[in-house]
Every structure is written in C-alpha cells, then in structure tokens.
Swiss-Prot record:
Disulfide bonds join 228-237, 274-287. Its EC number is 2.4.1.207. The active site is at residues 106, 110. It comes from Triticum aestivum. One of its GO terms (molecular function) is hydrolase activity, hydrolyzing O-glycosyl compounds. This is Probable xyloglucan endotransglucosylase/hydrolase. Its main location: secreted. The gene is XTH. Catalyzes xyloglucan endohydrolysis (XEH) and/or endotransglycosylation (XET). Cleaves and religates xyloglucan polymers, an essential constituent of the primary cell wall, and thereby participates in cell wall construction of growing tissues.
Length: 293
C-alpha cells in the first residue's frame, strides 16, 4: 500500500512539474545611471531623488530620450513609468529594445496619448529581421497617469512575453519552424523616449498636440536590466542555457497567466494584426501559436 501511494505521488509530482511555469523574477530597482545614459536633449531630462527617478519633458522645440549603456541578447527588462497626464493627445511615450542595423530586431511598448478623459492606448510590436507590422493595441484597465506601473519584457529563445505589472498582455512565440524569423542573434539596447507624433498617434493623426498644455512630462524609475550583455557584433550569449530565463519554467506561460492573457484579449484588446483580414489576405504564420486568435 505504501509503495502504491508513493508511486502515485511521484506520478502527480511529475505531471505538476511538466505544467509548471513561473513569473519573471522580481526586478531590482537601481539608479538611472547604473544602466542608462541620455541620448538627446539632455536639458529636457530632470533627475529626482539622486537619479532614482527621471522625468522626460516634451515641448514644442523637442522631446528627449535615453538608452542603455550596453547591448543584450535575452533577459528580463522592466521599467516603472507614470505617463503624461491630462491632455496628452499627439504624444508618444516609448520603452523598447532595438538592434542597430537595417534588418533590425525590435520589441516595442508605445503609449499613445489621449484627449483628457479618454483611455490610454498601449501598442506593442515585434520586429524580426527588419519586418514589423505586428501591432497589437489594448486599453489599459487603470489610469497610468496617476501612479507608477511596471512594464516589462521577458525575452528568451522560446518566447517574448510582454507584462503590465504582473499581467501578461502578449506572447510572441519562436516560430522558426514555421519560417518566421525570431530575434535571437542581434544584441539590442533598451531605449525610452517622449516625442511628438501627432501625425499618427491619436485617432490616426486627427487629434493634434495642444502645445498650450506643454511641457508634457513622463516619469520613470526602477531601471531594471537583467540580461546577457554582448557586443553589437555578437551572435550568441556566452552563458546561453545557464541563465534563469532559459530554464523550463520560463519557456511558456502557466495556466493562470494564460487566463489573465485571455482576459486582456477579451476585455481590453482593440486591435490585433492576427485578426485584421482587411489589411492581410492571409494570417501571419506565427499567429497559429496565438491561443486567442
């Protein structure tokens, strides 16, 4: 009887382990200058609390931005952001990874400004080998201008997962077997910027930036970077397979995370390129891996 019970417990444990996934590790908050440097219009960057908080300012003359000191192949990257409040129509606050060549890879968070009282739109996109056009858009389920919220990317050989706080909002699976290029051999820097894009950002460019409301300010803190640092010319991570994000529990979402993703898709998604039959005659191959399409 004891042997039978022990065998049963072993089977149950094996089944549970096969289904285990995990949330990314808790980010470590650090000062801005540990990982980042300004890229342009440094006079429009304001440092608060010894550089643990940074405010980007946009006016009619210029926006501004910053980038990481290093480039990375895979990892976990997050930022706490408080978006531009009030009438932010025409503005874009961006947090993204990008390589530096013509056939570039890129992983985007873009926050599209709104008229006062209208919800913010978060647009995500993935470029691989210079090909993008993979936009998805959601309405955020909270006011992102009232407090800081975490926006993060988990990028490994198996998937690119986008998170808002602890909620997954998008998963882009490695579909190399379907003939789809996947970002895996181009180190990327992280960037963030605040800029004017009133030719397209709000209602397709119909809503213009009201410069009487300037300056527009977006605030940042956290500055978490946990990645495999590599030169821009590197094609692989020297510790590939040994990092925490390479382990089996981080190769897919778990059941609870997929339920949260399904909730985002059902309640908050307003555009998904995978279902845009007017724009695309045939569904992109990688969309076959999207559970909610």
């Amino acid at each position: 009887m004891k042997a039978t019970a022990g065998a049963l417990l072993a089977v149950v444990a094996a089944v549970l382990l096969r289904g285990v996934a995990a949330a990314p590790r808790k980010p470590v908050d650090v000062p801005f200058d540990k990982n980042y440097v300004p890229t342009w219009a440094q006079d429009h960057i304001h440092y608060v609390n010894g550089g643990r908080e940074v405010q980007l300012s946009l006016d009619k003359t210029t926006g501004t931005g910053f980038q990481t000191r290093g480039s990375y192949l895979f990892g976990h990257f997050s930022m706490h952001i408080k978006l531009v409040g009030g009438d932010s129509a025409g503005t874009v606050t961006a947090f993204y990874l990008s390589s530096q060549n013509s056939e570039h890879d890129e992983i985007d968070f873009e926050f599209l400004g709104n008229r006062t009282g209208q919800p913010y739109i978060l647009q995500t996109n993935v470029f691989s080998g210079g090909k993008g056009d993979r936009e998805q858009r959601i309405y955020l389920w909270f006011d992102p201008t009232k407090d800081y919220h975490s926006y993060s990317v988990l990028w490994n050989l198996y998937m690119i997962a986008f998170f808002v706080d602890d909620t997954p909002i998008r998963v882009f699976k490695n579909s190399k077997d379907l003939g789809v290029r996947y970002p895996f051999d181009q180190p990327m820097k992280l960037y963030s910027s605040l800029w004017n894009a009133d030719d397209w950002a709000t209602r397709g460019g119909r809503e213009k930036t009201d410069w009487s409301k300037a300056p527009f300010v977006a605030s940042y803190r956290g500055f978490h970077v946990d990645g495999c640092e590599a030169s821009a010319e590197a094609k692989f991570c020297a510790t590939q397979g040994a990092r925490w994000w390479d382990q089996p529990e981080f190769q897919d979402l778990d059941a609870a995370q997929y339920r949260r993703l399904a909730w985002v898709r059902k309640e908050h998604t307003i555009y998904n390129y995978c279902t845009d039959h007017d724009r695309y005659a045939a569904m992109a191959p990688e969309c076959k891996r999207d559970r909610d399409v």
